Amino acid sequence: MLNILSITAPIYLSISTGYVATRSGFFSKLDMQVFGRFVLNFALPAMLFNALSLRDFQDVLHPSYLLAYALGSVMTFAIGFAVWRYGRRENLTLSALAGMGVSCSNSGYVGYPILLQILGPEAGVGMALTLLVENLVIIPLGISLADSGEAQHASWQHTVLASFMRLLKIPMLWAIVGGFVFSMMGWHLSEMLFKTVNLFALTCVGIALFVNGGSLVGMRVVGQMQSVAWMALFKLCLHPALVGLMLWTFGGMDVSLQIAGVLLASMPMMGIYPILGQRHGQEGFCAAALLVTTVASFFSISLLLWGLSQVPAWRVATGG
């Protein structure tokens, strides 16, 4: 168990450092937003491009993984949506936000740093494929349904199109596309450009964790504990269980990729979740869910890592 804590403890200590630095006033919430934009628009895209472009194409394109992760995530989304919509009698917008929250992980800020310690350079491939599913399937689905709940005059086709148009402005997606193209064509950056991109990629992990902690400052859970507890349970337990089931059902992929899928699904929800909720006046609910899920994930991820470490295939995939 100490080996597991040696993986998770540095991650959450880094998150705590960001929280304390922001809470004490050393940095402001506005500073965290600037750092966050740097990670999302420069550091993370650079890391994703390197992870894909430096490998053979057959090593980075895994249709079975994409399909398995997408199915597991959509199933989780559907269950979360149904529970809030029909079980808790919530409106369409909040139900859609709940579905998105329980099925879309914080892959870049928390997932990648953990995977990097376990799988090494292979972590980037699993994360890039997961980000494709999240950004092309789960987030557009959630945003479209949430917008539909407040824009009865607009057709769902218009809402979906608007969501995809917003996605075209995300540098991460272009980095993934560029990485796939370079890998497929066998292209390589010049040494000067490679070193430049790599400098940005190396800044990703520490700043991402620091920002994740700083973003938690000011979030409140008062009066919403029951709702967000269900969110945490679905995100940290149901999502990895369904993704793991789909990965096992499809099979035919490297064990390290299966481990990456289960671990990424077990991460807390994405850091921009409260921002997405703010567009619909639900930032309080989304922020509370993010806070509780992030804190609880230290224990759930540590337990999951311990369980996976007992499986013989884990030692083969991780070399440990």
Model-predicted segments: where are they?
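Alpha-helical transmembrane segments of multi-pass small-molecule/ion transporters
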Residues: M1-G320
